[in-house]
Amino acid sequence: MLDAAAGQRPIPSPASSAAPLPGARYFPTVRHNLAGPFLAYWQRFGGRGVLGLPRTEVFTEGGRRMQYTDHFLLHEAGGQVAPAPLGRLLSAGRVFPRVAPFASTPERLYVAATGHSLAGRFLAYWRAHAGAALLGALLSEVVVEGNGDNTGRRYPTQWFARGWLEYHAEHAGGRYAVELGLLGVEALRRRGWLPTR
């Protein structure tokens, strides 16, 4: 973000670089810390492989302490840290057509509450990574779109209340064929806290 009144100098934000803090885990590649309940949540629920790296320091907004990672916005409520419904916020205004109801099978899951389904690699990832507890409600069928990684590539993507999954054919059959999208990074760009592509 720039401050026009101050000669276009960057306005400090929670995404501004930080120095290592005592008692925190510091990540020099992104120059941010994780500490306290945010670090505990990060360690318990998959660390870098699931949540990604911290992209901000902890900040308070709307009376809640929050911290962005590559893939999520974590917020603290009642002493507990959990992902915020950032996927719902970033997909607001989009219309995702529902599918006709069907009986779920081991290969395809129908979610009656939202009228959407999960199948194939996305369903396997969802089952292996805490499903609704991590990602929240299913918001879409598979759509093809960019992921904010600055490459211009487009991927099959499926939206959830707290994130999105994307399929990377270049990693087919491997551990990284399905990945969490860079939802936290995208949200920070939209806020003007990270440079746009």
Predicted regions and their residues:
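Extended, compositionally biased repeat/scaffold regions that form elongated interaction surfaces
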Residues: 1-197
